[in-house]
Amino acid sequence: MTVISRVEHLPARPASRVAWVPAAAGWTVGVIATLSLIASVSPLVRSLIRVPREFVNDFIFNFPDTSFAWAFVLALLAAALAARKRIAWWVLVLYLVGAIGWNVGDLAAGGDTVADDIGELIGIAFHVAAIVFLVVARKEFWAKVRRGALLKSAAVLVAGNLIGIVVAWGLLQAFPGTLDPEWRLPYAVNRVSGFATVPTEVFEGYSHTFLNAIFGLFGALALMAAAIVLFQSQRASNALTGEDESAIRGLLELYGKNDSLGYFATRRDKSVVFAPNGRAAITYRVEVGVCLASGDPVGDPKSWPQAIAAWLQLCQAYGWAPGVMGASLAGAEAYRAAGLNALQLGDEAILHPDRFRLSGPDMRAVRQAVTRARRAGTSVRIRRHRELSPEEMAAVIRRADAWRDTETERGFSMALGRLGDPADDDCLLVEAVQGDEVVAMLSLVPWGSNGVSLDVMRRSPRSPNGTIELMVSELCMQAEDIGISRISLNFAMFRSAFEQGAQLGAGPVARLWRALLVFFSKWWQLESLYRSNMKYQPEWVPRYACYEDARLVPRVGVASVIAEGFLVLPFSRRNKQHTGEHIAAPDTLVQSGRLHRDGSAPDVTGLQGELPDADDEPRLPEQVRVRMAKLKALQGNGVDAYPVGQPPSHTVAQALGATDGETLSVAGRVMRIRDYGGVLFAQLRDWSGEVQLLLDNAALTEGETADFTATIDLGDLVEVTGSMGFSRNGTRSLLVERWRLIGKCLRPLPDKWKGLTDQEARVRARYVDLAVNTEARDLIRARSGALHAIRETLYSKGFLEVETPILQQIHGGANARPFLTHINAYDLDLYLRIAPELYLKRLCVGGVERVFELGRAFRNEGVDFSHNPEFTLLEAYQAHADYNVWIDGCRELIQNAAQAANGAQVFLRPRPNDPAGTLEPVDISGQWAVKTVHDAVSEAIGEHITPETELGELRRLCDSAGIPYLTHWDAGAVVLEMYEHLVEDRTTEPTFYKDFPTSVSPLTRPHRSIPGVAERWDLVAWGVELGTAYSELTDPVEQRRRLQEQSLLAAGGDPEAMELDEDFLQAMEYAMPPTGGLGMGVDRVVMMITGRSIRETLPFPLAKPR
């Protein structure tokens, strides 16, 4: 038997000079078949072509005047020749050889006229030439034919012909024409089953012309019935076997979480072809010479190319045109990579229950429909198929059949076609119930482990309006309880055409295309499917059809219509049970015994072990593979490479200070190994330090040094027990008595001397950097010490530490672009906070007089050496104080942090004119300089400015200094721009700049004595702003006015402007005491203390995706 799903890798066929022969032969025979068919039904055509037809019929090719049967045979032969079928080549060659013999026999017999002799010679020449071309091009006819039930098909053909002959004979008895009685039966045989090959002149008399057409039709019907039986048997015998379905179910469990249509691959009237490694498969059906694949390949995406290649080789081997229905974007890209073209068919409607809400204007239609159904007393019941008794499932099937609005079940790529099968007990049944009567139902197949995909939708004609909407809504509402997070509804074909054609201003082509689709929707429900899905506001996911050549699109379309059940062929049936006779699953899986003959899913763990690795799976580095092999060997010997933890008695630092001879244990990472045979030295590092291990066979109580070298690699975590002592050269060492592996390192550490030299690698692999780089550990310690010192300083002054919301409904407290997120529980957009200020001030209103928060803030802005989107911010507020109080307070916080991190009140700064960037300490003790903003700008620009300086004068100074500004800025904004360019960027040692313009300080109190400025200062050091403080604005009326101005800016498109926070303003109206507030960027302070960039001081700064 031919097993069509196991295909050898066929090489690409080289271009040939005679590649045109199959198409030419097919076209030639097809023209004769077409003319024969037309002549059989049209006396006019029969009369017009009589002379050439008789010449062709007598000398070249059988071409009777009327024969539906012969036209059908020639049509099959033409299609087979064009499809490069080897059997068609044999049939045509043998026919031509027979025709040569016929003509040669006539010539040898003699007695013909000269015209007949010439015709026979022309016929012989034509036949010889045709045979030569066919023989030369024989390799172009490579396509095989699937085995089928030949005997059954032949029996149908014989029975059909016998019936046709008997009926034809009876008609001739009734309407004999001029035929003699003894010639009537042979005449019927010739016309029904002999394709009218015997010339009419042989018979004594003639029959009526219309009877000739009827007799040919009898023969054609017999041939059609035989062909249908043959094709059905081919499909049935090559459909899924139980083992194939079992393998597909296993692949779905391993890899099917992303394909909503994956479960439909188990449909049993499909065939399947597997990738050679068995990790992927494609299910398909053959219709009208098109091998139609169903959706994406099933299985490991890495093996999709191999599965597609095997499928295309299958198409080539049998001369089928490849086509795909319902591929996803990923699947279409995989097919396109294999040489196919893709065309978007439409979109699949996906619902996400966590986002589904009946509220809102967009859901009004659904909400009203659900309300109507509920008022009619309809409730919803949701169960898995396995929860139904056999009697209940039988009732479900009866209702589904009774409510179906078509004679047959439709579907191919997006339907299962076997409701109630025991193998599908994980399917979900949703029923609408009125009283005790079920009035509608949905059946959904599994989509991975947490999704469902719609298979069957039925409703009773007596169901109330809104029943379907109620079932879908209840399914979404109860999804969390039944473990569902995604639902695939119907597929809307040509959705974009409906949507675009209905838009205002749509072009004439779009409107015409939509009108055509609306017209055809009367039969095929195109528009109704789109509208029934659209009202749920789904996510639309495109689905594609794939084809090899644009000329094949109509054939692929017809094959799809047939496969989906929109065009039902005579005697067609859809198999619900296994009919396949040839197992397509790889032999290794079949022989493993893990596949089940009933089609149920195999043991996934065992199946995964039987599947070889994907051919294109990237190979691990050699050192990793060696270490993995060592780990496997250790586990095979019963060694637990990752045991439960036991605290060592000492850290490395404590061990180094312990007395000699004292038994102790330490744990850490092995950084170096030096093996001298019987004595071995290793460097062990923990967080506190590094110690040398000395392993001597004479001192070890368990095992030998060779065991250590065989087991331990650099980077492994070990625990050792022994006592402190000295090596022969006097190095302080831990004399090891026993050891154990507590963590196998599967990847090698970087260079033991240089460590990670690439800065990007240090960011991405901070854990490795910390393991090998003491400098990285020092930075972590410095940061921790600085944070601790800041907290302790504030605690010592009586401040309370609090935590305020990070998720906020309104972004405020600073001018910055926020991050936006969404909370599904309330269907509400939220911001990650840009500052905790507004919540801390609420606490001040409530009477918390000294409060601070040290936490994370988020700003969707640039990233550079001093900026990170996620950063640590200190905000502190002290009642009955002003901004001057915080000059000393901020300085003390930073000096204490520097003391804790560096052991002295110093910043580390790069040494001037040093290319190596060597850091040197800069003293920051004592008082720091304090200047007003306007004085500092005046010093920098060389002209005196004050808060009263006119805007025009400020613009003139900007122009002369080359400082850009925007025309809508006021004087305060221009002064701020001058300050940032001329003062802030050029500042070195820590300096407080105070009294900023009021217009750029919306939350700050106006200066008590100087109009136009606010009581605010910024602390700047070496061009970096470290902190800012305010005399807070406590006047609620003025505060409202300023925030309203900010909200207008936000409404005008300024992404950094603050929104109006009505709750905050109402809190302020309860009166907040005079307060001084401080904001300090802790990351930047640590950056200055350590002399590093902000990314280096953060344990895990944000890094771009690889």
UniProtKB/Swiss-Prot annotation:
CDD domains: LysRS_N. PANTHER family: LYSINE--TRNA LIGASE, CHLOROPLASTIC_MITOCHONDRIAL, LYSYL-TRNA SYNTHETASE. Mg(2+) 2 binds at E1025. Its EC number is 6.1.1.6, 2.3.2.3. Pfam families: LPG_synthase_C, tRNA-synt_2, tRNA-synt_2_TM, tRNA_anti-codon. In the N-terminal section; belongs to the LPG synthetase family. In the C-terminal section; belongs to the class-II aminoacyl-tRNA synthetase family. GO terms for biological process: lipid metabolic process; lysyl-tRNA aminoacylation; response to antibiotic. SUPFAM superfamilies: Class II aaRS and biotin synthetases (SSF55681), Nucleic acid-binding proteins (SSF50249). It is found in: Cell membrane. Mg(2+) 1 binds at D1018, E1025. This is Lysylphosphatidylglycerol biosynthesis bifunctional protein LysX. It catalyses: tRNA(Lys) + L-lysine + ATP = L-lysyl-tRNA(Lys) + AMP + diphosphate; L-lysyl-tRNA(Lys) + a 1,2-diacyl-sn-glycero-3-phospho-(1'-sn-glycerol) = a 1,2-diacyl-sn-glycero-3-phospho-1'-(3'-O-L-lysyl)-sn-glycerol + tRNA(Lys). Coiled coil: none annotated. It comes from the Bacteria. Its cofactor is Mg(2+). It is a multi-pass membrane protein. GO terms for cellular component: cytosol; plasma membrane. The chain crosses the membrane at residues 18-38, 59-79, 87-107, 117-137, 155-175, 210-230, 307-327. Binds 3 Mg(2+) ions per subunit. Catalyzes the production of L-lysyl-tRNA(Lys)transfer and the transfer of a lysyl group from L-lysyl-tRNA(Lys) to membrane-bound phosphatidylglycerol (PG), which produces lysylphosphatidylglycerol (LPG), one of the components of the bacterial membrane with a positive net charge. LPG synthesis contributes to the resistance to cationic antimicrobial peptides (CAMPs) and likely protects M.tuberculosis against the CAMPs produced by competiting microorganisms (bacteriocins). The keyword Transferase applies. Gene3D superfamilies: Bira Bifunctional Protein, Domain 2, Nucleic acid-binding proteins.
